[in-house]
A protein has these predicted regions:
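Glycine/tyrosine- and acidic-biased, solvent-exposed loop/turn segments at the edges of beta-strands
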Residues: 4-227
């Protein structure tokens, strides 16, 4: 015959707890709390709950909608967020995914449409955007993409039509637009060319019809039209 020991975590209402210099205690107790703290509103509905060990958040942390559905879940280690945070729509589908490491966003964060398709995804390093950032139409077709370095646009930036065709392409350096921006018709034909220098229009700007004929031409110097 075999036997098993069942372990049940202690569960206490948040109203019975207090925080002293980042360490949680239960009123009337001298030992830092280990167990689950639950915040319940005046209607008796669970709003949030979190795991604690030795007075610090260690384990899951969850937030709930008024209907009882899970709204958000995250993981903590010694009061510091660590791991993948997931936020949910009220119907239970994932709304956000945000990776944390030592309390800072680290990795690829994603936001979703209610239909489950990715809306936006961006890469973070040490809580700062660094890498590719992309957005999508609700159909799943790429809407935009750009390169970000240390929180600033640095490299190409492209916009797309709902049919997937390129609509515009530009270049940035430390958040400042440089080089030639090209805009396109949905057919793929060139629509306009505009030169940028240090974030200002500089040079000859041209607009085209879909046959490729120049229909407008203007010259700029340091952002000011000169011809």
């Amino acid at each position: 015959m075999s036997s098993a020991l069942a372990f049940s975590q202690r569960v206490v209402k948040g109203s019975q707890a207090y925080d002293e210099k980042g360490v949680v205690y239960i009123q009337g107790e001298k030992t830092p709390y280990t167990g689950v703290l639950q915040n319940i509103n005046e209607k008796g509905i669970l709003e949030s709950e979190a795991e604690y060990k030795d007075g610090k958040m260690n384990g899951f942390s969850k937030l709930y909608y008024p209907n009882g559905k899970l709204g958000s879940e995250a993981t903590f280690k010694d009061n510091v967020q660590d791991g993948l945070q997931k936020d949910y729509f009220e119907d239970g589908k994932v709304k956000l995914e945000i990776p944390y490491k030592n309390g800072k966003v680290e990795g690829t964060a994603k936001e979703f449409y209610p239909n489950g398709k990715v809306f936006v995804e961006a890469t973070y390093k040490n809580a700062i955007k660094d890498g590719y950032e992309k957005s999508y139409y609700e159909t799943g077709v790429l809407q935009s993409e750009k390169i970000v370095k240390n929180g600033k646009m640095d490299g190409f930036s492209k916009l797309y039509y709902p049919n997937g065709k390129l609509g515009s392409e530009a270049t940035f350096k430390a958040d400042v637009q440089v080089g030639v921006q090209k805009d396109y018709y949905e057919s793929g034909k060139l629509k306009a060319e505009v030169s940028y220098k240090n974030g200002k229009v500089d040079g000859v700007a041209k607009a085209y019809d879909e046959t490729g004929k120049v229909i407008e031409q203007v010259t700029f110097k340091n952002g000011v039209q000169v011809k």
